[in-house]
């Protein structure tokens, strides 16, 4: 659907955010199946739960503006999963897998953050301040997840560095 007006552009972007959030929830489930780290699994389960709440908020946005999500044809998330499956299958190290999964989570999360940032501005520009408020809360949830993911990565790296120092000191 080519967008010709600000409203059509907003509807297309909101539809894309809904689809991306829905697909991201499925990706979180698949990523969680690859990793054995309980902290990462917990984070993914929590994120999947929060994603369902975000979908509810986005659906409310559509209700407020009196529209339905548009049909989209993008394959970004399918390609993301295909590439992920190929790359992670070749990894042997559990630590490398954990970091890889978290890096992929970071990529996916930052795509969502960018979408929500634009949507908040677009909602305000089109006069849908209630919608902007709901989208801002979606953005906040996603920013928290990005920060938590960053902290998980830091924790894994700190443990790995400490292990290396212990080996070096023992030698």
Q: Where do the language-model regions lie?
A:
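Amphipathic alpha-helical hairpins
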Residues: 1-171
